[in-house]
Amino acid sequence: RFTPNQTSVNDRQTSQNHGSNPVRSTQCCDPELSGTVLELLNTYPPVGFVPLFVDVPASPAGTHAAPDPFLTQTETILRTGAPITDLIGLGIGLTPSGDDFLCGVLAGLTLLGLRDSQDFRHLSAEISRNLAKTNAISAAFLRCAMDGQFSEALVTLGSVSFVQSLQMFHDIGHSSGADTLCGLYFALCGLYFAFG
């Protein structure tokens, strides 16, 4: 799973999830907010990209769930240095998990005050070039995120109670709230700069 700590990106440790190695990054850019995001992620079942970022319960004894192909593909994209925009349109649902994740990354970069940075402009340009990979509704959400327009759940995160945030994110689709939080966590913990 992707976890931040104070070690370098090259440090690795054995993981139980899909037999992979969790990626370590530099210390979180915003430890308090990223801690809240991680707490929120821990309230979700293993939907969307959640298993890449938090420990999820193992399958019951004697059962072997096949690895989710979207998770496997996402993990490959995030670990190999492939363009993060390869996530556009990846997954199922009205707004695919990859698109929700990218909205979260854009929100995280915005929260870190990086909207005017070269990284943000480059990511936005790449997303714009690849919007044809997803559906019209999801493309509209990505355009809004590139313009700094985010859901109420994202805008109020940190200014409302944990319980209110929890409810707002859980109200966003089957896995969209969770996938957005994964992207936000990815950006807030500096993982975007290591792997994006």
What residue spans do the PLM features occupy?
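Phosphate/adenylate-binding glycine loop and adjacent helical scaffold
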Residues: R1-R12, G19-N21, S25-G89, G93-G98, ...
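Internal, well-folded beta-alpha domain core
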Residues: F101-L102, G113
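Acidic, glycine-rich low-complexity/disordered segments
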Residues: S117-R121
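Long, charge-rich alpha-helical interaction segments
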Residues: E126-S128
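Intrinsically disordered, low-complexity linker/propeptide segments enriched in Ser/Thr/Gly/Pro
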Residues: C189-F195
